[in-house]
């Protein structure tokens, strides 16, 4: 991604919380330590999409992580509705029909479409169990090439794949990496993880961080430490 980003803007805080009230309380605790937030299934289905406009009006960026995957017409209509909310990013699964529909439907709204290659909780054995013949690395590469040809704005990938993908897609596609864990943090249910500094060095543009921040005793201090690590890695 050619755009120069401030360290704080490269950290996306995942608001994986059960209610709008809990999310708003976390945002208040984080204050100016964070500028970019992710709303996923849990919060979205608890009314969290109502926060998108308010956050945008407050100068924050919002990543709506719904991983849309349906027939093209249905995805397109969903993207049209979501594009009016004021979000910065929206995820879809990296299937050609889904990606094409999303790119066409967002129009000139400014909404950036991110394609999810392979979930960071999956490894080769999970793909084999699901019936895939390709391993994680091969499937990620295949989907990345398809996404680039379709005009996708960014890819969601594990930090382990970032360096490899950067060599494939160049600098014009943003790489967004979940599975970020500061040194010493628990991996949780993620199988392909990396520290913030290593992920930046591998070529990631944006780092999604959830539990290490929202479950920390001092979320603001945890977020500030990650931003400092990003700043050092990009200096």
UniProtKB/Swiss-Prot annotation:
Metabolic or biological pathway, per its Swiss-Prot or TrEMBL entry: Pyrimidine metabolism; UMP biosynthesis via de novo pathway; UMP from orotate: step 2/2
**What CDD domains has UniProt attached to this entry?**
OMP_decarboxylase_like (cd04725)
One Pfam family from the UniProt entry?
OMPdecase
Identify the GO cellular component terms for this protein: cytosol
Q: Establish whether keyword Lyase is in the entry.
A: yes
Gene Ontology terms for molecular function: orotidine-5'-phosphate decarboxylase activity
Recorded hits in InterPro entries, A to Z, give: Aldolase_TIM, OMPdecase, OMPdecase_AS, OMPdecase_bac, OMPdeCOase_dom, RibuloseP-bd_barrel
Substrates-to-products reaction catalysed: orotidine 5'-phosphate + H(+) = UMP + CO2
- Stored HAMAP family: OMPdecase_type1_B
* Protein name in the entry: Orotidine 5'-phosphate decarboxylase
Q: What is the originating organism of this protein?
A: Rhodopseudomonas palustris (strain BisB18)
């Amino acid at each position: 991604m050619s755009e120069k980003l401030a360290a704080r803007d490269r950290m996306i805080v995942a608001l994986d919380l059960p209610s709008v009230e809990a999310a708003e309380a976390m945002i208040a605790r984080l204050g100016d330590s964070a500028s970019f937030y992710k709303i996923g299934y849990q919060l979205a289905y608890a009314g969290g999409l109502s926060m998108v406009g308010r956050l945008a009006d407050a100068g924050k960026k919002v990543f709506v992580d719904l991983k849309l995957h349906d027939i093209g017409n249905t995805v397109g209509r969903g993207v049209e509705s979501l594009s009016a909310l004021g979000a910065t990013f929206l995820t879809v699964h990296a299937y050609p029909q889904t990606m094409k529909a999303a790119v066409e439907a967002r129009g000139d709204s400014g909404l950036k479409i991110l394609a999810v290659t392979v979930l960071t909780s999956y490894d080769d054995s999970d793909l084999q169990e699901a019936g895939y013949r390709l391993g994680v690395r091969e499937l990620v590469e295949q989907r990345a090439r398809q996404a680039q040809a379709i005009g996708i704005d960014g890819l969601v990938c594990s930090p382990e794949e970032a360096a490899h993908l950067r060599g494939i897609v160049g600098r014009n596609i943003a790489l967004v990496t979940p599975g970020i864990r500061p040194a010493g943090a628990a991996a949780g249910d993620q199988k392909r993880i990396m520290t913030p500094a290593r992920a930046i060095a591998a070529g990631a543009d944006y780092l999604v961080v959830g539990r290490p921040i929202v479950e920390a005793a001092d979320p603001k201090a945890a977020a500030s430490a990650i931003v400092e690590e990003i700043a050092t890695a990009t200096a």
